[in-house]
Amino acid sequence: MTFKSGFVAILGRPNVGKSTFLNYVMGQKIAIMSDKAQTTRNKIMGIYTTEEEQIVFIDTPGIHKPKTALGDFMVESAYSTLREVDTVLFMVPADEKRGKGDDMIMERLKQAKVPVILVVNKIDKVHPDQLLEQIDDFRQQMDFKEIVPISATQGNNVNRLMEILKENLDEGFQYFPADQITDHPERFLVSEMIREKVLHLTREEIPHSVAVVIESMKRDEFTDKVHIRATIMVERDSQKGIIIGKQGAMLKKIGSMARRDIELMLGDKVFLETWVKVKKNWRDKKLDLADFGYNEKEY
């Protein structure tokens, strides 16, 4: 029996459901999710393996017009995947008309030397007539290998998309062990789970200004708990106040919710210590970006 494998990039504007799709396919949380745009900042691999094939999905940051050095990093990180994959999934939402952001991405995709599949997500939110209009509009913009409507939250038609991807795989190596599901270390996943709770619980001005640094992560041999010390970085004192909350209530809530997710992922009891620090304008300082895990070497 021949083994097939390939790399698949998931591209699109912010908030179209790329991470939701990846988590659904993997059957567990690999990429954090929130209703805030630009939640994903780093490229994240989801490694899907069966006895017959391995598909390495690369979830990318939402492509937008960058306003900071962090934004530049995110967009370049997304586009750089075009150089390293066999297929691109270009994801668009069924419930929003084609916009300038979509057109900008398609101009780059037209230059790509790999097949592009249009994935129209969130079909559960629209009438079939509206979906057909959306598909027709995009079909006129460029030549897609396939067009597949799905609902990543409900799983509608995701199996069909997976069948198409499997059909288009070439014979190849198994690049990763069968039990490995992502390329990122546990520390990265832990920091992302904490950041997800900050995004979920805080107001609009906070999300883009937050980074999470894991200062230490080790098992206590006496309690058999994993001790994690994490620092939440923000850009302004006012943001620090919001995250700490009245008498520390917000920070406690963030920690409690994050700890539950981390325990599920690690399969261990966790003692989580969280601190908040101000680092002014860190999103525009390359040294700070590298310190907080946003490194140009990634692309």
From Swiss-Prot:
Xref: SUPFAM superfamilies: P-loop containing nucleoside triphosphate hydrolases, Prokaryotic type KH domain (KH-domain type II)
Residues that bind GTP: 12-19, 59-63, 121-124
Membrane topology of the entry: Peripheral membrane protein
Record's subcellular location: Cytoplasm; Cell membrane
Region of interest (G3), ranges: 59-62
Keywords: Cell membrane, Cytoplasm, GTP-binding, Membrane, Nucleotide-binding, Ribosome biogenesis, RNA-binding, rRNA-binding
Residue segments, region G4: 121-124
Gene3D superfamilies: 3.30.300.20, P-loop containing nucleotide triphosphate hydrolases (3.40.50.300)
A GO molecular-function annotation: small ribosomal subunit rRNA binding
Record-linked InterPro entries: G_ERA_dom, GTP-bd, GTPase_Era-like, KH_dom-like_a/b, KH_dom_type_2, KH_sf_prok-type, P-loop_NTPase, Small_GTP-bd
Domain KH type-2: 202-280
Annotated region (G1), positions in chain: 12-19
Gene Ontology BP annotations: ribosomal small subunit assembly
UniProt-annotated stretches for the region G2: 38-42
GO cellular component: cytosol; plasma membrane
Keyword rRNA-binding part of the UniProt annotation: yes
Known role: An essential GTPase that binds both GDP and GTP, with rapid nucleotide exchange. Plays a role in 16S rRNA processing and 30S ribosomal subunit biogenesis and possibly also in cell cycle regulation and energy metabolism.
Family note: Belongs to the TRAFAC class TrmE-Era-EngA-EngB-Septin-like GTPase superfamily. Era GTPase family.
Subunit and interaction comment: Monomer.
HAMAP family: GTPase_Era
Protein's name in the database: GTPase Era
Organism: Streptococcus suis (strain 05ZYH33)
